[in-house]
Design a protein with these regions (language model features):
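Low-complexity, Lys/Gly-biased intrinsically disordered segments
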Residues: 27-67, 83-86, 152
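Extended amphipathic alpha-helical segments enriched in small hydrophobics
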Residues: 172-200
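Glycine- and charge-enriched low-complexity intrinsically disordered segments
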Residues: 134-143, 151-152
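Hydrophobic structural patches
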Residues: 6, 17-21, 179-187, 212
Length: 213
């Protein structure tokens, strides 16, 4: 079954990431110094059809943040919807990180996207490897730091102004790239098994529908 295998691979991957991060002997820097720009997205008014009809701009929601790389999404908005909201276009090879309600979902963009509120777009500086940043933000170290700054309210939120102050061990870019290679094989296996599981669920749903036609 794919689910236990996915869980096992995820556990091993987490252990590798944590070992690599905890073994770093390097200077610390504030998280805010690692990116060129960062910010939450926003949702265009849903009652205005001109913000959505025939839209071509990918609009990412929390359900899209399920794998290491964002390769597809379900929803789109128009250029007008982008202009009339607080959404902004997050470039390719950036990080998306959910910081509201469901906190901690993360992916790397493979094409420009905008997001709803509660999802941060993070554009790394040139001296920061996006693969390393992905794994660092997936580490127990970072998750614990996030848990300490989450505010309770109508919705749990980790605000960017607080995330920016998290101290991060940041080695040279060459070392970052070396660390990022360590869990990559397991990550590929996880993504593959998740794709198979998704296909299986779709086939099952199709067969169930056919039974009642």
């Amino acid at each position: 079954c794919a689910i236990p295998l996915i869980k096992d691979c995820a556990v091993y991957r987490s252990a590798i990431i944590d070992y690599a991060i905890n073994s770093l002997d390097t200077d610390f820097a504030k998280f805010g110094s690692l990116y060129e720009t960062a910010g939450e997205g926003g949702t265009p008014t849903t009652s205005n059809a001109s913000f959505y009809d025939n839209g071509k701009i990918p609009f990412v929601k929390i359900d899209d943040l399920k794998q290491k790389y964002l390769t597809e999404n379900k929803d789109f908005i128009t250029e007008l919807g982008l202009q009339k909201s607080s959404a902004w276009l997050v470039p390719t090879r950036s990080i998306l990180f959910s910081n509201g309600a469901t906190i901690g979902e993360i992916t790397i963009t493979t094409y420009p996207v905008c997001t709803k509120q509660g999802i941060l777009g993070i554009v790394p500086k040139s001296n920061i490897d996006v693969e390393f940043l992905y794994y660092f933000m997936s580490s127990t170290y970072f998750k614990k730091a996030i848990s300490r700054i989450v505010t309770e309210g109508t919705m749990k939120t980790a605000y960017l102004k607080d995330i920016a102050n998290i101290l991060c061990p940041i080695p040279t870019k060459e070392k970052q790239q070396g660390i990022a290679k360590m869990p990559s094989a397991l990550n590929s296996k996880i993504d593959y098994e998740q794709s198979l599981l998704k296909l299986f669920i779709m086939q099952k749903q199709y067969l169930l529908r056919q039974m009642f036609i």
